[in-house]
Amino acid sequence: MTNDRVQDEIRHALGVRPQIDPATEIARRVEFLVDYVLTTGVRGLVLGISGGQDSTLAGRLCQLAVEDLRRRGAEAEFWAVRLPHHVQNDEADAQDALSFIAADHELAINIGAATDATAEQYEKATGEQITDFGKGNVKARMRMIAQFELAGEKKALVVGTDHAAEAVTGFFTKFGDGAADVIPLAGLNKRQGRELLRHLGAPDHLIVKVPTADLLDDEPGQTDESSLGLSYDQIDDFLEGKEIEPAAASALIEKYRRSEHKRRTPVAPTDTWWIRH
């Protein structure tokens, strides 16, 4: 199968539209959240806010959704949660994001002590120090534990920030930031997310902020693009069906194939999707 055909299949599988209307997409995704909250009978939404593009956008959509729900007579609230590991270097951006989102409730749960305790117990049990990469994944999973803890107490849903540019590369922690009840940004690539933020009136410095997972102690602020070896422009072009450098296209296709397990529920003996033909 040619790369062009695989590219088209991936784009369709992830639900990416080459062109979008920001106002329409915002309305569609807010309505999706409203409908799902009403269907599940929960009382609200919970989302971790980092100060990056994705959580800023998802957070504003969540607040718009619960306001819409209340206008319809439903009980619904939104909890925006800061989840720093000790001290976050870009805390000012996180606070700016919270101001823009204007959530019903803001709170902070510091995951530093819990993450460090897990690392200490791992070293005690194995005699080995956990790698920086491994600890980074623990941070992501600890954040999700905290969000589900809050959501369980508030009878709410956990909102994830996964979008097409992350999904195609598998650039998320399995059962960490990849774990959520609902993902309203699905099908959007990075540049489309920026379009929605501009339409919503987000601060410019949050819209153009260089994306970083910020999970590594040894390399704080390492950019997504550095980790991926690809630019988001290349990823977005690929997802929109545009031609990109053959080497970049092949790299993306391989990342997509290798990360398929992250986009699936746990594999069972009856599953066949994982078998390479």
PLM region spans:
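A non-catalytic, amphipathic alpha-helix used as a structural packing/dimerization or gating element
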Residues: 24, 28-32, 188-199, 251
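Predominant activation on well-ordered alpha-helical scaffold segments within soluble catalytic domains
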Residues: 59, 63, 95, 148, ...
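Catalytic subdomain that performs nucleotidyl-dependent activation
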Residues: 77, 103, 135, 143, ...
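Intrinsic disorder and flexible/low-complexity segments
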Residues: 242-277
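Short, structured secondary-structure boundary patches
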Residues: 58, 66-70, 127-132, 178-184, ...
